[in-house]
From Swiss-Prot:
Identification of the protein by name: Odorant receptor 67d
Tissue specificity as recorded in UniProt: Expressed in antenna.
Cytoplasmic side: 1-45, 93-140, 186-191, 290-297
Pfam families in the cross-refs: 7tm_6
Main location: membrane
Name of encoding gene: Or67d
Organism expressing this protein natively: Drosophila melanogaster
Amino acid sequence: MLKMAKVEPVERYCKVIRMIRFCVGFCGNDVADPNFRMWWLTYAVMAAIAFFFACTGYTIYVGVVINGDLTIILQALAMVGSAVQGLTKLLVTANNASHMREVQNTYEDIYREYGSKGDEYAKCLEKRIRITWTLLIGFMLVYIILLGLVITFPIFYLLILHQKVLVMQFLIPFLDHTTDGGHLILTAAHVILITFGGFGNYGGDMYLFLFVTHVPLIKDIFCVKLTEFNELVMKRNDFPKVRAMLCDLLVWHQLYTRMLQTTKKIYSIVLFVQLSTTCVGLLCTISCIFMKAWPAAPLYLLYAAITLYTFCGLGTLVENSNEDFLSVIYTNCLWYELPVKEEKLIIMMLAKAQNEVVLTAADMAPLSMNTALQLTKGIYSFSMMLMNYLG
């Protein structure tokens, strides 16, 4: 009977990296390449985003100035947030390509070094890559299903209800979308832009998910090292090795802090843009639903809500990891069995763990589920006010 070869954690990690690189490479932003620099595809994507912004401005002009319809502003701005998010992720990650590679390669080195040690280390790696892989696939399905439905809605309306409905809420200058040919060209442009936007946003999100979900991995391996350290301390017969292992624990905690600081440095602005534009998009989409101006609005509303809570959930993940790290150092470490000099090292590490780095939206608000709840309350209040206004 043939047995399937076991896939090592490092191989699964590299598989995740390849999938992310394919998505971001689709938009010319493969920052994992040591020789990365912006090239024609990168600039083409930026030009496409600029084209979308210009067409959105034109759409607002036509609606407000020519047709006298102020509601077109809300309709046109509903999906602008996604474009702003994509452009921000592209520019920020391209500008921080070296830091992106540093974090990515650090985690890969951890997989290579500790995957070969087996036992508890291998379990930590397998658990973490399983969580990461599940998150990536789950979010991919969200993108494919919801954005796919947004694209197919106009086809359904055209074939079944014989109505011409736009995929995205923007017009192209000098193109008459009321004709069959004009509507087809406009729909094709919408589909192309939303496809590129989906790939780009997904790839940008996955790098953040990869980095944040692997922060607890360092904490988990620290716990295994601490268990080995305690066992050696209780033997009381190899103090030089005890001191060496203690120094290793200090280095590991510094690595945890450095990975958090680097991730925050890269994504602080991205997270601010993500939260702010998602909230604006939610408000505009809710307005479209009340005005019955965009049949696919409920789908985009669901996508935006999932995005908001997923990103805030990442912040809570980091907060929980920090609390666990502090608890492990304080309760699991046999610091009282060490000489005074070594106890001071533990106290220093404990003091640092009490003021650990957390993810924020440009240092303006912590990224957490509590923040998501507060934003949801504000959006709910706006929805009730709009409902009363529209009667």
